Amino acid sequence: MRQDQYNQPISTTSEAAQDAYINGITRFLAADAGIDTTFQRAIAADDSFALPHLGLARFYQMRGRGADVAAPLARARALVADATPREQAQVNALGLLMEGKGPQAYAAIRAHLAEYPRDVMIAQTCMGVFGMIGFSGRRGREAEQLAFTSSLVPHLGDDWWFQSQHAFALLEVGRTAEAEPVIEQSLATNPRSGNGAHIRAHLYYENGEAEAGLRYIDEWRNGYSKEGLLHCHVSWHVALWALEQGDLAKMWSVLDADVAPGGAEAPPINIMTDTASLLYRAELAGHDVPAERWSAISDYAKQCFPKPGIAFADAHAALAHA
């Protein structure tokens, strides 16, 4: 039996499937482009291997392609009966999450990590602003997030992806001095990680280093595909710093090319929230925002989020509609 990059057994005998699956996980954790095609290569090499089907379904969910989730998830469930207990538990937990069964999924995820703390595809669900903790709305979630990442340090502390997430958890509770060496170590191992670069930008912001932050993230994104899951959002950071420094031409240029509908290639929640928030911040800074820009993002919000239910999206949609 083969293993993934975390030395966990995976149920395939195909070296090509193993290599492609490992590559898919790496791309997923780095918010890189080509996640779907890489998992599809693993499937092509061994269609009976359940986890690439699951990874593809999870990517579709993250990308906002909800209609595409069901088929690969069903295939993963059909195939995993003969796999290892860890793989079976991973399919169960992520399946609950993708079906919108949040409380059941969270219970399954925490139980899974108690037994398999190096299962990053499960740990990832509870990391960052959009994770199950950060997106929960619970009071004290920042401290809860740090407690969660801290519990995994003995198991994943030397991993570049985990280091980026632990650094962000430290930032969120104001422990910037502790976060800096952690994110620097992460980026030293994988300097092209979208998650790492994004969190490094947050550290620049928290330290009040606007010029250095803009220079860093603007240069970094030059080599980042627009298909990357975080391209829209790191571009938002560029536009926001350009606004702060009074470079309105750059702000509008980046917004139109890489953040707003028609320019960005990103999950709809990022396009809508980043565009609405940037327009609002421009107005707060005393700049005129043409009405047609607000109309365009209002129309996009109506199209992609026609019903309320996601508080983060709803608040930004309200800005767009105001």
Predicted regions and their residues:
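Alpha-helical repeat scaffolds
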Residues: Q40, D68-V80, P103-Y116, R139-P154, ...
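Residue-level recognition of tetratricopeptide repeat
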Residues: A16, D47-P52, P85, P117-I122, ...
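Residue at a conserved register position within TPR or TPR-like alpha-solenoid repeats
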Residues: R27, Y60, L96, F130-I133, ...
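Inter-helical turn/loop elements of alpha-helical hairpins
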Residues: N23-Q40, A44-P103, F130-E142, N207-A210, ...
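"A position-specific structural signal for the A-helix of alpha-solenoid helical repeats
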Residues: E15, I22, G55, E87-G95, ...
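Helix-coil-helix junctions within alpha-helical repeat/solenoid scaffolds
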Residues: A242-A322
